[in-house]
Protein backbone atom coordinates (compact mmCIF):
# COMPACT_ATOMS: atom_id res chain seq x y z
CA UNK A 1 0.00 0.00 0.00
CA UNK A 2 1.47 3.33 -1.04
CA UNK A 3 0.57 5.51 1.93
CA UNK A 4 2.41 8.76 2.47
CA UNK A 5 5.06 7.52 4.91
CA UNK A 6 5.55 11.00 6.34
CA UNK A 7 2.10 10.52 7.86
CA UNK A 8 2.68 7.07 9.27
CA UNK A 9 3.79 7.89 12.79
CA UNK A 10 1.02 10.37 13.47
CA UNK A 11 -0.82 8.20 15.96
CA UNK A 12 -3.82 9.06 18.07
CA UNK A 13 -3.80 10.51 21.54
CA UNK A 14 -6.96 9.37 23.18
CA UNK A 15 -7.28 6.50 25.66
CA UNK A 16 -10.02 4.90 27.97
CA UNK A 17 -11.10 1.46 29.79
CA UNK A 18 -13.41 -1.44 31.11
CA UNK A 19 -14.11 -5.12 31.93
CA UNK A 20 -12.15 -7.96 30.36
CA UNK A 21 -13.84 -9.88 27.56
CA UNK A 22 -10.96 -11.74 25.98
CA UNK A 23 -8.73 -12.04 22.98
CA UNK A 24 -10.22 -11.97 19.50
CA UNK A 25 -7.91 -13.92 17.21
CA UNK A 26 -6.61 -12.70 13.87
CA UNK A 27 -8.18 -13.68 10.56
CA UNK A 28 -11.11 -12.07 8.80
CA UNK A 29 -12.81 -9.18 10.57
CA UNK A 30 -15.94 -11.16 11.29
CA UNK A 31 -14.11 -14.28 12.38
CA UNK A 32 -11.78 -12.31 14.61
CA UNK A 33 -14.56 -10.55 16.40
CA UNK A 34 -16.57 -13.73 16.88
CA UNK A 35 -13.78 -15.83 18.37
CA UNK A 36 -14.60 -16.83 21.93
CA UNK A 37 -12.79 -14.78 24.59
CA UNK A 38 -9.50 -16.40 25.58
CA UNK A 39 -6.24 -15.42 27.20
CA UNK A 40 -3.04 -14.86 25.25
CA UNK A 41 0.22 -16.32 26.50
CA UNK A 42 1.10 -15.35 30.06
CA UNK A 43 2.62 -11.93 30.43
CA UNK A 44 1.31 -10.42 27.21
CA UNK A 45 -1.34 -7.75 26.87
CA UNK A 46 -4.65 -8.69 25.30
CA UNK A 47 -7.41 -6.83 23.51
CA UNK A 48 -10.52 -7.09 25.68
CA UNK A 49 -13.44 -5.67 23.69
CA UNK A 50 -12.58 -5.93 20.03
CA UNK A 51 -11.83 -3.10 17.62
CA UNK A 52 -13.90 -0.34 16.04
CA UNK A 53 -13.31 2.26 13.33
CA UNK A 54 -15.17 5.53 13.03
CA UNK A 55 -15.55 8.96 11.42
CA UNK A 56 -14.09 7.62 8.16
CA UNK A 57 -13.53 10.15 5.37
CA UNK A 58 -11.57 9.98 2.12
CA UNK A 59 -8.17 10.28 3.81
CA UNK A 60 -8.73 9.75 7.53
CA UNK A 61 -10.24 7.42 10.11
CA UNK A 62 -9.96 6.61 13.80
CA UNK A 63 -9.48 3.10 15.22
CA UNK A 64 -10.45 2.18 18.79
CA UNK A 65 -9.55 -0.64 21.14
CA UNK A 66 -9.08 -1.54 24.81
CA UNK A 67 -6.33 -3.40 26.62
CA UNK A 68 -6.27 -5.47 29.80
CA UNK A 69 -3.19 -3.58 31.07
CA UNK A 70 -1.08 -0.52 30.18
CA UNK A 71 0.33 -0.98 26.68
CA UNK A 72 1.12 0.91 23.48
CA UNK A 73 -1.52 0.71 20.75
CA UNK A 74 -0.20 0.01 17.24
CA UNK A 75 -2.30 -0.18 14.08
CA UNK A 76 -1.27 -1.70 10.76
CA UNK A 77 -3.19 -0.83 7.58
CA UNK A 78 -3.15 -2.55 4.21
CA UNK A 79 -5.19 -3.11 1.08
CA UNK A 80 -4.38 -6.80 1.48
CA UNK A 81 -6.07 -9.08 4.04
CA UNK A 82 -2.71 -10.81 4.63
CA UNK A 83 -1.20 -7.41 5.57
CA UNK A 84 1.77 -7.90 3.30
CA UNK A 85 3.51 -4.55 2.98
CA UNK A 86 1.29 -2.99 5.66
CA UNK A 87 1.97 0.44 7.05
CA UNK A 88 2.07 1.00 10.79
CA UNK A 89 0.56 3.84 12.81
CA UNK A 90 1.89 4.41 16.31
CA UNK A 91 -0.97 5.05 18.69
CA UNK A 92 -1.25 6.11 22.31
CA UNK A 93 -0.26 4.38 25.51
CA UNK A 94 -3.42 2.93 27.03
CA UNK A 95 -3.54 3.69 30.75
CA UNK A 96 -6.00 3.38 33.64
CA UNK A 97 -6.69 7.11 33.30
CA UNK A 98 -8.83 6.29 30.28
CA UNK A 99 -9.88 2.85 31.50
CA UNK A 100 -7.27 1.33 29.17
CA UNK A 101 -9.15 2.37 26.02
CA UNK A 102 -7.51 4.26 23.20
CA UNK A 103 -7.83 5.63 19.69
CA UNK A 104 -5.31 5.85 16.90
CA UNK A 105 -5.90 8.47 14.23
CA UNK A 106 -5.12 7.28 10.72
CA UNK A 107 -4.17 9.95 8.20
CA UNK A 108 -2.98 9.86 4.62
CA UNK A 109 -5.22 6.95 3.65
CA UNK A 110 -6.10 6.26 0.00
CA UNK A 111 -9.59 7.39 -1.00
CA UNK A 112 -12.30 5.01 -2.13
CA UNK A 113 -10.59 1.84 -0.93
CA UNK A 114 -11.50 -1.12 1.23
CA UNK A 115 -8.73 -1.30 3.81
CA UNK A 116 -7.84 -3.94 6.35
CA UNK A 117 -6.45 -2.91 9.72
CA UNK A 118 -5.14 -4.83 12.68
CA UNK A 119 -4.44 -3.71 16.20
CA UNK A 120 -1.67 -5.01 18.44
CA UNK A 121 -0.75 -3.92 21.95
CA UNK A 122 2.97 -3.52 22.64
CA UNK A 123 4.52 -4.17 26.04
CA UNK A 124 5.84 -0.97 27.59
CA UNK A 125 8.97 -2.58 29.05
CA UNK A 126 9.83 -5.51 26.78
CA UNK A 127 10.66 -4.58 23.21
CA UNK A 128 8.97 -6.78 20.62
CA UNK A 129 6.47 -8.34 23.03
CA UNK A 130 2.94 -7.73 21.73
CA UNK A 131 -0.58 -9.03 22.02
CA UNK A 132 -2.17 -11.24 19.43
CA UNK A 133 -3.56 -9.05 16.62
CA UNK A 134 -7.22 -8.21 16.20
CA UNK A 135 -8.37 -7.28 12.71
CA UNK A 136 -11.03 -5.05 11.22
CA UNK A 137 -11.85 -3.34 7.98
CA UNK A 138 -13.12 -0.02 6.69
CA UNK A 139 -13.93 1.70 3.42
CA UNK A 140 -12.63 5.19 2.86
CA UNK A 141 -14.91 7.72 1.20
CA UNK A 142 -14.56 8.07 -2.57
CA UNK A 143 -13.07 11.14 -4.22
CA UNK A 144 -15.18 10.58 -7.33
CA UNK A 145 -18.82 9.68 -7.69
CA UNK A 146 -19.42 6.13 -6.45
CA UNK A 147 -22.21 4.08 -4.91
CA UNK A 148 -22.63 4.68 -1.17
CA UNK A 149 -24.61 2.64 1.34
CA UNK A 150 -25.08 2.97 5.08
CA UNK A 151 -27.40 1.87 7.87
CA UNK A 152 -28.77 3.75 10.85
CA UNK A 153 -30.62 3.03 14.08
CA UNK A 154 -30.37 3.62 17.83
CA UNK A 155 -31.45 2.43 21.29
CA UNK A 156 -29.43 -0.53 22.58
CA UNK A 157 -30.09 -2.42 25.84
CA UNK A 158 -33.06 -0.32 26.90
CA UNK A 159 -35.95 -0.96 29.29
CA UNK A 160 -34.18 -3.91 30.89
CA UNK A 161 -33.81 -5.92 27.65
CA UNK A 162 -30.13 -6.76 27.43
CA UNK A 163 -27.92 -9.43 25.93
CA UNK A 164 -29.97 -12.63 25.77
CA UNK A 165 -27.63 -15.45 24.66
CA UNK A 166 -30.56 -17.83 24.21
CA UNK A 167 -31.89 -15.60 21.39
CA UNK A 168 -28.53 -14.85 19.80
CA UNK A 169 -27.77 -11.66 21.70
CA UNK A 170 -27.96 -8.44 19.69
CA UNK A 171 -28.67 -10.29 16.47
CA UNK A 172 -29.94 -7.23 14.62
CA UNK A 173 -26.27 -6.44 13.99
CA UNK A 174 -26.02 -9.62 11.90
CA UNK A 175 -28.88 -8.35 9.72
CA UNK A 176 -27.25 -4.94 9.42
CA UNK A 177 -23.91 -6.45 8.45
CA UNK A 178 -25.63 -8.57 5.80
CA UNK A 179 -26.53 -5.51 3.70
CA UNK A 180 -22.80 -4.68 3.53
CA UNK A 181 -22.94 -0.98 4.47
CA UNK A 182 -20.04 1.45 4.17
CA UNK A 183 -20.77 2.71 7.68
CA UNK A 184 -23.27 2.71 10.55
CA UNK A 185 -24.88 5.96 11.68
CA UNK A 186 -25.67 5.48 15.36
CA UNK A 187 -28.50 7.84 16.28
CA UNK A 188 -27.78 7.70 20.01
CA UNK A 189 -28.82 5.74 23.08
CA UNK A 190 -25.95 3.38 22.38
CA UNK A 191 -26.15 2.57 26.08
CA UNK A 192 -28.89 2.87 28.71
CA UNK A 193 -27.07 4.26 31.73
CA UNK A 194 -30.36 4.66 33.59
CA UNK A 195 -31.55 1.12 32.84
CA UNK A 196 -30.63 -1.52 35.45
CA UNK A 197 -31.13 -5.14 34.49
CA UNK A 198 -32.25 -8.31 36.21
CA UNK A 199 -31.16 -11.82 35.23
CA UNK A 200 -34.67 -12.81 34.16
CA UNK A 201 -37.83 -11.05 32.98
CA UNK A 202 -41.23 -12.76 32.65
CA UNK A 203 -42.72 -12.28 29.18
CA UNK A 204 -46.48 -11.90 28.56
CA UNK A 205 -46.69 -15.27 26.79
CA UNK A 206 -45.18 -17.15 29.74
CA UNK A 207 -41.65 -17.40 28.40
CA UNK A 208 -38.66 -16.06 30.33
CA UNK A 209 -36.22 -13.49 28.98
CA UNK A 210 -32.69 -14.12 30.28
CA UNK A 211 -30.18 -11.28 30.49
CA UNK A 212 -26.44 -11.40 30.75
CA UNK A 213 -25.85 -9.05 33.70
CA UNK A 214 -22.63 -7.34 34.81
CA UNK A 215 -22.13 -5.49 38.12
CA UNK A 216 -22.48 -2.08 36.46
CA UNK A 217 -25.87 -3.07 35.04
CA UNK A 218 -27.45 -3.80 38.43
CA UNK A 219 -28.04 -0.11 39.23
CA UNK A 220 -28.30 3.26 37.52
CA UNK A 221 -24.94 4.71 36.49
CA UNK A 222 -23.66 7.60 38.60
CA UNK A 223 -19.88 7.24 38.88
CA UNK A 224 -17.41 7.39 36.01
CA UNK A 225 -16.67 3.69 36.52
CA UNK A 226 -20.37 2.87 36.26
CA UNK A 227 -20.79 4.90 33.06
CA UNK A 228 -17.78 3.14 31.57
CA UNK A 229 -19.37 -0.16 32.50
CA UNK A 230 -22.44 0.63 30.40
CA UNK A 231 -20.31 0.67 27.24
CA UNK A 232 -18.34 -2.41 28.26
CA UNK A 233 -21.59 -4.29 28.78
CA UNK A 234 -22.74 -3.92 25.19
CA UNK A 235 -19.30 -4.92 23.94
CA UNK A 236 -19.79 -8.29 25.65
CA UNK A 237 -22.10 -9.15 22.73
CA UNK A 238 -20.59 -11.30 19.99
CA UNK A 239 -22.67 -9.92 17.12
CA UNK A 240 -22.00 -6.32 18.13
CA UNK A 241 -18.23 -6.87 18.32
CA UNK A 242 -18.24 -8.61 14.94
CA UNK A 243 -20.22 -5.75 13.42
CA UNK A 244 -17.87 -3.16 14.90
CA UNK A 245 -14.88 -4.90 13.34
CA UNK A 246 -16.55 -4.91 9.95
CA UNK A 247 -18.51 -1.62 9.76
CA UNK A 248 -17.22 1.82 10.84
CA UNK A 249 -19.46 4.01 12.99
CA UNK A 250 -20.61 7.62 12.94
CA UNK A 251 -21.79 8.25 16.48
CA UNK A 252 -23.99 10.85 18.15
CA UNK A 253 -25.45 10.70 21.63
CA UNK A 254 -29.03 10.99 22.85
CA UNK A 255 -30.43 11.06 26.39
CA UNK A 256 -29.83 7.58 27.82
CA UNK A 257 -26.07 7.92 27.65
CA UNK A 258 -26.72 10.07 30.75
CA UNK A 259 -30.32 9.48 31.88
CA UNK A 260 -33.83 9.68 30.45
CA UNK A 261 -34.89 13.06 29.01
CA UNK A 262 -32.11 15.01 30.73
CA UNK A 263 -31.18 18.63 30.08
CA UNK A 264 -28.31 20.82 31.32
CA UNK A 265 -28.76 22.37 34.74
CA UNK A 266 -31.42 19.88 35.80
CA UNK A 267 -31.56 18.73 39.42
CA UNK A 268 -33.35 15.40 39.68
CA UNK A 269 -35.33 13.52 42.27
CA UNK A 270 -35.46 10.08 40.73
CA UNK A 271 -35.32 6.64 42.36
CA UNK A 272 -31.86 5.13 42.66
CA UNK A 273 -29.85 8.33 42.33
CA UNK A 274 -27.70 9.73 45.13
CA UNK A 275 -26.13 12.31 42.79
CA UNK A 276 -28.93 14.75 41.94
CA UNK A 277 -27.01 17.20 39.73
CA UNK A 278 -27.42 16.22 36.11
CA UNK A 279 -24.45 18.33 35.04
CA UNK A 280 -22.19 16.16 37.22
CA UNK A 281 -23.68 12.98 35.77
CA UNK A 282 -23.45 14.32 32.21
CA UNK A 283 -19.76 15.18 32.60
CA UNK A 284 -18.98 11.63 33.72
CA UNK A 285 -21.12 10.12 30.97
CA UNK A 286 -19.54 12.36 28.35
CA UNK A 287 -16.05 11.26 29.35
CA UNK A 288 -17.00 7.58 29.21
CA UNK A 289 -18.69 8.14 25.86
CA UNK A 290 -15.58 9.68 24.31
CA UNK A 291 -13.42 6.92 25.76
CA UNK A 292 -15.58 4.13 24.34
CA UNK A 293 -16.71 5.36 20.91
CA UNK A 294 -14.59 5.66 17.74
CA UNK A 295 -15.08 9.38 17.17
CA UNK A 296 -12.52 11.97 16.20
CA UNK A 297 -13.91 14.29 18.88
CA UNK A 298 -11.37 14.94 21.63
CA UNK A 299 -12.99 15.11 25.06
CA UNK A 300 -9.92 16.62 26.69
CA UNK A 301 -10.49 19.94 24.96
CA UNK A 302 -14.26 19.95 25.35
CA UNK A 303 -14.75 18.71 21.82
CA UNK A 304 -17.98 19.41 20.00
CA UNK A 305 -20.17 16.44 19.28
CA UNK A 306 -21.81 18.24 16.35
CA UNK A 307 -19.76 17.89 13.20
CA UNK A 308 -19.92 17.24 9.46
CA UNK A 309 -18.56 14.02 7.99
CA UNK A 310 -18.08 14.07 4.22
CA UNK A 311 -18.36 10.75 2.43
CA UNK A 312 -17.61 11.62 -1.16
CA UNK A 313 -19.24 13.99 -3.66
CA UNK A 314 -22.70 12.45 -3.20
CA UNK A 315 -22.99 12.63 0.60
CA UNK A 316 -22.39 14.91 3.57
CA UNK A 317 -23.62 13.82 7.01
CA UNK A 318 -24.42 16.54 9.54
CA UNK A 319 -24.26 15.11 13.06
CA UNK A 320 -26.36 17.20 15.45
CA UNK A 321 -25.97 17.45 19.23
CA UNK A 322 -29.46 17.90 20.67
CA UNK A 323 -28.38 17.39 24.30
CA UNK A 324 -25.45 19.60 25.29
CA UNK A 325 -27.17 22.94 24.64
CA UNK A 326 -30.77 21.92 25.30
CA UNK A 327 -33.11 24.22 27.20
CA UNK A 328 -35.25 22.81 30.06
CA UNK A 329 -38.20 20.60 29.21
CA UNK A 330 -41.39 22.64 29.56
CA UNK A 331 -44.73 22.81 27.75
CA UNK A 332 -42.59 24.37 24.99
CA UNK A 333 -44.80 27.29 24.03
CA UNK A 334 -42.18 30.01 24.49
CA UNK A 335 -42.03 32.75 21.86
CA UNK A 336 -38.42 33.67 22.67
CA UNK A 337 -35.39 32.23 24.39
CA UNK A 338 -33.11 29.24 23.78
CA UNK A 339 -33.95 25.96 22.09
CA UNK A 340 -32.33 22.59 21.51
CA UNK A 341 -29.27 23.41 19.46
CA UNK A 342 -27.94 26.71 20.74
CA UNK A 343 -26.79 29.69 18.70
CA UNK A 344 -23.33 28.33 17.89
CA UNK A 345 -24.64 25.04 16.52
CA UNK A 346 -27.41 26.72 14.51
CA UNK A 347 -24.88 29.08 12.93
CA UNK A 348 -22.56 26.15 12.18
CA UNK A 349 -25.34 24.11 10.57
CA UNK A 350 -26.47 26.98 8.36
CA UNK A 351 -22.92 27.74 7.29
CA UNK A 352 -22.03 24.13 6.53
CA UNK A 353 -25.29 23.39 4.72
CA UNK A 354 -24.83 26.39 2.48
CA UNK A 355 -21.20 25.46 1.79
CA UNK A 356 -21.91 21.79 1.08
CA UNK A 357 -21.32 20.67 -2.50
CA UNK A 358 -22.58 17.14 -1.87
CA UNK A 359 -25.67 16.01 -3.74
CA UNK A 360 -27.33 14.72 -0.55
CA UNK A 361 -27.28 16.27 2.90
CA UNK A 362 -28.18 13.82 5.66
CA UNK A 363 -29.23 15.55 8.88
CA UNK A 364 -28.66 13.15 11.79
CA UNK A 365 -31.13 14.40 14.40
CA UNK A 366 -31.28 12.25 17.52
CA UNK A 367 -34.68 13.75 18.37
CA UNK A 368 -37.44 13.57 15.71
CA UNK A 369 -38.56 16.81 14.11
CA UNK A 370 -42.30 16.26 13.81
CA UNK A 371 -43.19 13.69 16.47
CA UNK A 372 -44.54 14.83 19.82
CA UNK A 373 -42.32 13.30 22.51
CA UNK A 374 -43.76 13.78 26.02
CA UNK A 375 -41.62 14.02 29.15
CA UNK A 376 -43.49 12.98 32.26
CA UNK A 377 -40.44 12.51 34.49
CA UNK A 378 -41.36 15.57 36.60
CA UNK A 379 -45.05 14.72 36.75
CA UNK A 380 -45.89 17.60 34.43
CA UNK A 381 -47.10 17.78 30.80
CA UNK A 382 -43.62 18.72 29.60
CA UNK A 383 -42.14 17.95 26.21
CA UNK A 384 -38.82 16.33 25.39
CA UNK A 385 -38.40 17.00 21.68
CA UNK A 386 -38.93 19.61 18.97
CA UNK A 387 -42.66 19.36 18.26
CA UNK A 388 -45.12 20.69 20.84
CA UNK A 389 -48.33 19.36 19.37
CA UNK A 390 -50.57 22.35 18.65
CA UNK A 391 -50.17 22.18 14.83
CA UNK A 392 -49.76 25.96 14.77
CA UNK A 393 -47.07 28.53 14.10
CA UNK A 394 -43.61 27.65 15.44
CA UNK A 395 -43.27 28.00 19.20
CA UNK A 396 -40.64 26.88 21.68
CA UNK A 397 -38.01 24.67 20.11
CA UNK A 398 -39.79 24.66 16.77
CA UNK A 399 -38.53 28.21 16.21
CA UNK A 400 -34.92 27.07 15.74
CA UNK A 401 -35.90 24.58 13.08
CA UNK A 402 -38.20 27.02 11.30
CA UNK A 403 -35.17 29.31 11.10
CA UNK A 404 -32.96 26.53 9.70
CA UNK A 405 -35.55 25.35 7.16
CA UNK A 406 -36.27 28.89 6.03
CA UNK A 407 -32.56 29.59 5.64
CA UNK A 408 -32.10 26.44 3.57
CA UNK A 409 -34.88 27.47 1.20
CA UNK A 410 -33.57 31.02 0.86
CA UNK A 411 -30.07 29.81 -0.01
CA UNK A 412 -31.22 26.94 -2.21
CA UNK A 413 -29.88 24.15 -0.02
CA UNK A 414 -31.38 21.14 -1.75
CA UNK A 415 -31.79 17.46 -0.96
CA UNK A 416 -31.86 17.38 2.82
CA UNK A 417 -32.98 14.09 4.40
CA UNK A 418 -33.44 13.80 8.16
CA UNK A 419 -32.69 10.51 9.95
CA UNK A 420 -33.57 9.76 13.56
CA UNK A 421 -34.38 7.02 16.08
CA UNK A 422 -35.39 7.75 19.73
CA UNK A 423 -39.07 6.74 19.70
CA UNK A 424 -38.62 2.95 19.38
CA UNK A 425 -40.57 2.25 16.20
CA UNK A 426 -40.07 2.88 12.50
CA UNK A 427 -41.79 5.43 10.24
CA UNK A 428 -41.52 7.60 7.14
CA UNK A 429 -42.67 11.24 7.28
CA UNK A 430 -43.03 13.68 4.40
CA UNK A 431 -42.92 17.36 5.31
CA UNK A 432 -45.20 19.27 2.95
CA UNK A 433 -45.22 23.08 3.07
CA UNK A 434 -48.67 23.07 1.44
CA UNK A 435 -50.04 21.43 4.60
CA UNK A 436 -47.93 23.30 7.13
CA UNK A 437 -48.68 26.14 9.53
CA UNK A 438 -45.16 27.37 8.73
CA UNK A 439 -44.60 26.98 5.01
CA UNK A 440 -41.36 28.84 4.22
CA UNK A 441 -39.35 25.72 3.39
CA UNK A 442 -38.81 23.19 0.63
CA UNK A 443 -40.45 19.78 1.12
CA UNK A 444 -38.30 17.08 2.67
CA UNK A 445 -38.40 13.60 4.23
CA UNK A 446 -37.64 12.33 7.73
CA UNK A 447 -37.18 8.63 8.41
CA UNK A 448 -37.35 7.02 11.85
CA UNK A 449 -35.85 3.66 12.77
CA UNK A 450 -35.10 1.73 15.96
CA UNK A 451 -34.73 0.25 18.44
CA UNK A 452 -31.69 -1.97 18.01
CA UNK A 453 -32.41 -4.01 21.14
CA UNK A 454 -34.81 -2.33 23.56
CA UNK A 455 -38.47 -2.08 24.42
CA UNK A 456 -40.62 -1.12 21.44
CA UNK A 457 -43.16 1.71 21.80
CA UNK A 458 -45.28 4.08 19.77
CA UNK A 459 -46.60 5.39 17.63
CA UNK A 460 -46.30 9.04 18.65
CA UNK A 461 -48.57 11.86 17.48
CA UNK A 462 -47.46 13.93 14.50
CA UNK A 463 -47.36 17.72 14.75
CA UNK A 464 -48.54 19.76 11.75
CA UNK A 465 -46.39 22.85 12.21
CA UNK A 466 -44.08 21.74 9.40
CA UNK A 467 -46.72 19.79 7.51
CA UNK A 468 -45.61 16.32 8.57
CA UNK A 469 -47.64 13.60 6.85
CA UNK A 470 -47.37 9.92 7.68
CA UNK A 471 -46.35 7.70 4.75
CA UNK A 472 -45.48 4.54 6.67
CA UNK A 473 -45.13 3.26 10.19
CA UNK A 474 -44.77 -0.01 12.04
CA UNK A 475 -45.16 0.00 15.81
CA UNK A 476 -45.81 -2.70 18.42
CA UNK A 477 -49.27 -3.65 19.71
CA UNK A 478 -48.38 -2.63 23.27
CA UNK A 479 -45.78 -0.56 25.10
CA UNK A 480 -42.37 -2.01 25.97
CA UNK A 481 -42.65 -4.98 23.64
CA UNK A 482 -39.54 -7.12 24.16
CA UNK A 483 -37.08 -7.91 21.36
CA UNK A 484 -38.29 -11.52 21.62
CA UNK A 485 -41.54 -10.33 20.01
CA UNK A 486 -39.78 -8.50 17.19
CA UNK A 487 -40.45 -4.81 16.45
CA UNK A 488 -36.73 -3.97 16.34
CA UNK A 489 -35.75 -1.91 13.32
CA UNK A 490 -32.95 -0.33 11.32
CA UNK A 491 -32.86 1.77 8.18
CA UNK A 492 -30.67 1.54 5.10
CA UNK A 493 -29.69 4.35 2.73
CA UNK A 494 -28.25 3.57 -0.70
CA UNK A 495 -27.11 6.22 -3.19
CA UNK A 496 -26.68 5.17 -6.80
CA UNK A 497 -23.67 6.80 -8.44
CA UNK A 498 -25.10 6.85 -11.96
CA UNK A 499 -28.53 8.37 -11.25
CA UNK A 500 -27.71 9.97 -7.86
CA UNK A 501 -31.00 8.52 -6.61
CA UNK A 502 -31.09 8.02 -2.83
CA UNK A 503 -33.17 5.04 -1.71
CA UNK A 504 -34.26 4.56 1.89
CA UNK A 505 -35.33 1.11 3.05
CA UNK A 506 -36.80 0.50 6.50
CA UNK A 507 -35.98 -3.02 7.72
CA UNK A 508 -36.93 -5.27 10.62
CA UNK A 509 -34.89 -7.38 13.03
CA UNK A 510 -34.17 -10.00 10.37
CA UNK A 511 -33.37 -7.49 7.64
CA UNK A 512 -36.72 -7.85 5.86
CA UNK A 513 -37.62 -4.75 3.85
CA UNK A 514 -40.79 -3.13 5.20
CA UNK A 515 -40.88 0.10 3.20
CA UNK A 516 -38.75 1.53 0.41
CA UNK A 517 -38.67 5.10 -0.85
CA UNK A 518 -36.45 6.24 -3.74
CA UNK A 519 -35.72 9.97 -3.79
CA UNK A 520 -34.58 11.83 -6.89
CA UNK A 521 -32.26 14.79 -6.28
CA UNK A 522 -33.56 18.28 -6.93
CA UNK A 523 -31.22 20.29 -9.11
List each language-model region with its residue ranges:
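Metal-dependent phosphoester/phosphodiester hydrolase catalytic core
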Residues: 2-23, 32-523
Amino acid sequence: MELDRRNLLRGGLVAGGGAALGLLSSGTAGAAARTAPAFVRSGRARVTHGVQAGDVTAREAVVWTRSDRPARMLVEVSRRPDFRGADRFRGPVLTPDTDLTGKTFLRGLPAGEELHYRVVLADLDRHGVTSAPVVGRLRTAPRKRADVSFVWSGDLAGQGWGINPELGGYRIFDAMAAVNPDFFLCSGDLVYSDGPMTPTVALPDGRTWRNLVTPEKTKVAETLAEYRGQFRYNLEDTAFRAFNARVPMLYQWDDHEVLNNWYPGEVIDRPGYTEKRVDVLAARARRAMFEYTPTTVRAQVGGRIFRKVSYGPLLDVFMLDMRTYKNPNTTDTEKSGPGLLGAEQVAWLKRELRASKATWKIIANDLPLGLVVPDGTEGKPNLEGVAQGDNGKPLGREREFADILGYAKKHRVRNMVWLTADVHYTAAHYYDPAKAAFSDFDPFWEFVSGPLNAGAFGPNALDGTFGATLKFQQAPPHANTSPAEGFQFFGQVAIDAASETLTVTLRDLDGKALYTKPLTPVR
